[in-house]
Amino acid sequence: MVQILRDMDEFKTFLKAAGHKLVVVEFSAKWCGPCQSIYPIYHAMSLQYQNVFFANVDVDVSPALAESCNVKAIPTFQMFKKNQKVTLFSRIERIICCYRSGFKVKQIYEFCGADAKKLEEKIKQLM
């Protein structure tokens, strides 16, 4: 099941309730075509991976929450464990990635776009 989050208090409570389990948060909007196309798949994943906590934040309903999570595009998927954003790369991979990009890489723990395959791969990798 996908939990709808409306504000920072709900967000923090949700992360705390997840404990050590993976949390996947989708930031989306009702008017966004790619968001509409990925949502049924995202919902199905929430039923398939019951040991993962899934949430949705509508950026139009909760702009302050989206801003505090530094969301710049939609859909954006952010992943958390133990109340922290998950880093998807090892430390050495981050250093190499940052070096190659001229140290302009800031967000390596999330991705944007309606790529269901990529989303599922990351969930499996982090479970």
Language model features with spans:
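Beta-strand cores of modular interaction/reader domains in eukaryotic scaffold and signaling proteins
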Residues: 4, 23-26, 53-56, 76-80, ...
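A short beta-strand-turn-helix
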Residues: 4-22, 63
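Thiol-based oxidoreductase modules, predominantly thioredoxin-like and allied folds used
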Residues: 5-6, 27, 39-64, 71
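Acidic, Ser/Thr-rich intrinsically disordered and amphipathic helical segments
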Residues: 10, 37, 41, 118-121
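Alpha-helical recognition domains of nuclear gene-regulatory proteins
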Residues: 14, 41-48, 65-68, 110, ...
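Aromatic-flanked redox-active Cys/Sec active sites in thiol-based oxidoreductases
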Residues: 26-32
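The canonical Cys-X-X-Cys-His
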Residues: 32-35, 77
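Non-catalytic, surface beta->alpha helical segment in thiol-disulfide oxidoreductase systems
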Residues: 73, 79-127
